[in-house]
């Protein structure tokens, strides 16, 4: 089970040897090269991008544009596609809902969503439906966690205008059949939105191969700072949509009566840019490019398999969709008859950090007939020590609650 160990690249984990961080699906830790790049920006280059002709403002703007190009190359976006920088994956999805869907959808139209979507990929569409009279159709996974393509063929039909789902399920790590769903949607002329947030650290999705119309992700789940998200879409599609935020930086000309907006992608980037976060994304991409991706994925898979084997030996524990056809580095579980927050609290006292709650996926929790669960998620810095620590801590939970 030996593989590349990148733990030495992460200062927080080095300074806190007792920490067993198994919450990377919530946010990854930041490697030293990212932190150093951000510090260099703040101490040598800090300026308000696009707000001045002096060196610092110009250099900051160049850093953003260079990161835009690097991001497009990283996800293999077609030359016809633009990269819009947002503050988060949530904002990216809201731009699509407000600027694409709201002006186009009408009563009788349908939006097809996976029940396993994050709230950020549900709530904006509910708003669109309230405003337009459109309705939502849901795709449900089978007992093992796999979306049924035959069911999707029935749900995705002539009245479908948008199909939106996660590449990797936030709560369970199950991998959705993105290419098949995209093909079904395009057969009926529907637009496809893919939330790639959970996929980015497990092998970068190839947007050109996916063929989707909109692809979104957040930087902080792939080693960058909080505060930067990405929206990738065809330039012509973005040009056909109105702006989302209005103000400085997204206009070419303003009079007392009217404004002339910049073209895409800049018309979606109103307000002062979070240049430091964008710089961190550039550094994170370069860090990801330096990794032995196949070895990293194999290592994470081995850790995941080792943990699952241990969890399945505990009679007082249940897992959710852990036997999906394909799953990437996330295991959802509960100690029977114990609230997930209580379990996570005790694990935390043992130095094991997992997420508990509904994982911003309440409809999915309802579908699973649970209120909440714990979620352990792996990344490149995890080792068998983390698996063993979680296993020991779960035995402690079992003793405390006298589980049999």
UniProtKB/Swiss-Prot annotation:
Swiss-Prot/TrEMBL catalytic activity: (sulfur carrier)-H + L-cysteine = (sulfur carrier)-SH + L-alanine
PROSITE patterns xrefs: AA_TRANSFER_CLASS_5
Class of this enzyme: transferase
Enzyme active site: 360 (cysteine persulfide intermediate)
Disulfide bridges in this chain: none
EC number(s) recorded for this UniProt protein: 2.8.1.7
Keyword flag Transferase: yes
Keyword Nucleus: no
GO biological process: cysteine metabolic process
Annotated Pfam families: Aminotran_5
Family named by the database record: Belongs to the class-V pyridoxal-phosphate-dependent aminotransferase family. Csd subfamily.
Protein name: Probable cysteine desulfurase
UniProt source species: Treponema pallidum (strain Nichols)
Organism taxonomic ancestry: Bacteria, Pseudomonadati, Spirochaetota, Spirochaetia, Spirochaetales
């Amino acid at each position: 089970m030996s593989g590349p160990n990148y733990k030495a690249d992460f200062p927080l984990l080095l300074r806190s040897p007792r920490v067993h961080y198994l919450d990377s699906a919530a946010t990854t830790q930041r490697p030293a090269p990212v932190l150093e790049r951000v510090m260099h920006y703040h101490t040598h280059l800090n300026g308000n991008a696009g707000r001045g002709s002096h060196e610092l403002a110009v250099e900051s703007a160049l850093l953003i544009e260079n990161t835009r190009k690097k991001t497009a190359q990283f996800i293999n976006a077609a030359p016809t596609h633009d990269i819009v920088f947002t503050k988060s994956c949530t904002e990216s999805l809201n731009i699509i809902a407000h600027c694409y869907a709201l002006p186009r959808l009408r009563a009788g139209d349908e939006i097809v969503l996976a029940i396993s979507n994050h709230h950020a990929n549900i709530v904006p569409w509910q708003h669109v439906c309230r405003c337009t009279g459109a309705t939502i159709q849901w795709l449900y996974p089978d007992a093992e966690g796999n979306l049924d393509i035959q069911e999707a063929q029935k749900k995705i039909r002539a009245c479908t205008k948008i199909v939106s789902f996660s590449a990797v399920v936030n709560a369970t790590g199950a991998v959705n059949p993105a290419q098949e769903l995209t093909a079904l949607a395009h057969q009926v002329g529907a637009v496809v939105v893919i939330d790639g947030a959970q996929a980015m650290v497990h092998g970068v999705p190839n947007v050109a191969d996916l063929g989707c119309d909109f692809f979104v992700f957040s930087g902080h789940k792939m080693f960058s700072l909080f505060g930067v998200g990405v929206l990738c879409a065809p330039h012509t599609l973005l040009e056909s949509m109105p702006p989302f935020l209005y103000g400085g930086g997204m206009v070419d000309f303003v009079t007392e009566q009217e404004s002339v907006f910049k073209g895409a992608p800049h018309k979606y980037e109103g307000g002062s840019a979070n240049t430091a976060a964008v710089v961190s994304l550039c550094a994170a991409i370069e860090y990801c490019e330096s990794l032995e991706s196949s070895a990293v994925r194999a290592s994470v898979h081995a850790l995941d398999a080792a943990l699952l084997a241990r969890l399945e030996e505990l009679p007082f524990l249940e897992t959710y969709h852990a036997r999906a056809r394909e799953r990437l580095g996330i295991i959802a579980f509960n100690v029977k008859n114990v609230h997930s927050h209580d379990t996570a609290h005790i694990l935390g006292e043992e130095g094991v950090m997992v997420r508990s709650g509904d994982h911003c996926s309440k409809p999915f929790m309802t579908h699973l007939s649970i209120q909440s669960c714990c979620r352990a998620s792996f990344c490149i810095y995890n080792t068998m020590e983390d698996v063993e620590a979680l296993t020991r801590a779960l035995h402690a939970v079992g003793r405390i609650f006298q589980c049999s």
